[in-house]
Amino acid sequence: MASTQLSDIFVADYYGTLEPANSPEKTAVYESGIITRSATLDNIAKNGQGTSEISYWQDLDADEAPNISSDDPDDLGAVGKAEQGSMRARTLYLNKGYGVSDLTAELANSEPMQHIRNRFGTYWTRQWQRYLMGAGRGIIAANIAQNGGDMVKDAGASISANAFQDAAFTAGDAADMFGAIGVHSVVMNQMVKQDMIEYLRDSQGKIILATYLGKPVFMDDALTYAPGQFLSLFFGQGAFGYGEGDPHMPVEMQRNAAGGNGGGAEVLGERKTYILQPAGFSWQGSENRNLSPTAAQYASAANWKRVFDRKQVPFAAVISGTATP
């Protein structure tokens, strides 16, 4: 009996309408509110350029005292100035292909296209979070290098509640803006041992979310600072803006008759156009459309520059652990 081939069941238009069970939008990170989809970033992602400038109005200077009104017509009030600034956003052009041998189990399912779509959903979710955490590491590294680390506190050998509190209050009276925390598994272990973690459970008692002071806590072992040291990141509401473009061919199935030593080979590929923009920071890296940065390059201090004042930036961090040679 002949086995099912990808080409036997693949219908591009139908495939494109399927929602992956594990799409980025369904992750706890996205649902926490720290990432906000932006129509502006959607439009930029669709413009076909590697980078674009985003203009914004700077806040009025609250340190300027108001004029004192009088009845003297010649007493002219001082006029303040509203100024614009700009930041650069980087578009990511990404793709991934799976060969038919990678999808054998999915082809055996009663809904093979949905299962294949779910496989891609899981893949993109992991990549998406790597870029997000990479950007978080990069902007903190940039803050230390360029701004004297005014968003960062050092906890010493082990994490503590005091260190978390001190980090949050680097934002002064805006400290209540933080809505989620990302930590390394070593730090999470320390938090659990110190009874800092509370858990949300579903109706069956299954843990669905770990929290600290009501804030979701996410584990990612990419959150290191140096050998032996860890980076815990605070994210505020809307910490990242998110946009998605329209690849010319977002999904494509290719069959190569000569592949497989003449037995035929099939590859299903997806293409993504993303923007993930940390609030208050401007991209300083490569602008080449054909050289999209990797998640590791997102984590480089040299690729980011803060353009907002400290209190307007929804990020803070704690460094913990003991550096090893």
Give the ranges of each region predicted by the language model:
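N-terminal "assembly arms/tails" that initiate or stabilize quaternary assembly
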Residues: 1-89, 293, 302-325
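Extended, compositionally biased alpha-helical segments that mediate assembly or anchoring
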Residues: 2-8, 239, 243-325
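Short helix/loop capping segments that flank catalytic or ligand/cofactor-binding pockets
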Residues: 62-65, 108, 190-193, 199-200, ...
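Extended serine/threonine-enriched, polar tracts that run as long, contiguous segments within proteins
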Residues: 185-188, 196, 203-267, 271-272
